[in-house]
A protein has these predicted regions:
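Non-catalytic DNA-recognition/assembly elements of restriction-modification systems
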Residues: 1-55
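A generic structural signal for short, non-catalytic loop/turn and secondary-structure boundary residues
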Residues: 7, 40-41, 69-71, 86, ...
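A structural detector for beta-sheet-dominated domains
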Residues: 7, 15, 103, 146-148
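Aromatic/pi-system hotspot detector in well-structured domains
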Residues: 9-12, 17, 111-119, 127-132
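Short loop/beta submotifs within extracellular cysteine-rich repeat domains
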Residues: 55-56, 122-127
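A short beta-sheet element
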Residues: 57-117
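A short glycine-rich beta-alpha junction/loop motif
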Residues: 90-101, 129-148
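Short leucine-rich amphipathic alpha-helical surface patches
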Residues: 119-123, 144-147
Length: 148
């Protein structure tokens, strides 16, 4: 078995690695939005929530015509409670669920699982009252994650 050389590994800012978007006077990773249950129609697009079960999937719905309804593909979801999953398929995100998509490379299962383990270690330092929406995901230009 080849030994992994980690001598060049370093810290990175969330905003250096993942796609961000402007929000008010700051950058943040894309996030989902609250959609009333009455507006969701059964379909084939998974809806990701903060649950720790079934890869975060709460149900399957059709696309709806709303500025708040956003669909992402091939991404890592991170909820404000710290649940993290890889989604190689199209999915919509509920409120307080963030979308991590690499800036310059497509995710694959191996890269995603590696990044998930690194992110889980990093966010384990946050307490419930720090909820992730108020910490690294909401200020990705400042927060660093160390790969170790």
């Amino acid at each position: 078995m080849n030994k992994l050389d980690i001598s060049d590994w370093q810290e990175f800012r969330i905003s250096e690695l993942f796609i961000t978007e402007p929000s008010k006077n700051k950058l943040q990773v894309p996030t989902g939005a609250s959609i009333a249950r009455k507006d969701l129609v059964d379909g084939d697009i998974p809806r990701i929530t903060v649950t720790n079960f079934n890869n975060g999937i709460v149900g399957y719905y059709k696309n709806i015509d709303s500025d708040n309804y956003r669909v992402f593909e091939n991404f890592i979801s991170v909820s404000f409670l710290g649940t993290i999953f890889y989604h190689p398929y199209k999915a919509s995100l509920d409120m307080k669920v963030h979308c991590l998509k690499l800036k310059n490379k497509d995710l694959n299962k191996d890269i995603a699982l590696f990044l998930i383990s690194v992110i889980k270690k990093h966010i384990s330092y946050f307490a419930y009252n720090d909820q992730l929406m108020y910490s690294p995901m909401s200020r990705p230009e400042y927060h660093k994650i160390k790969i170790e």
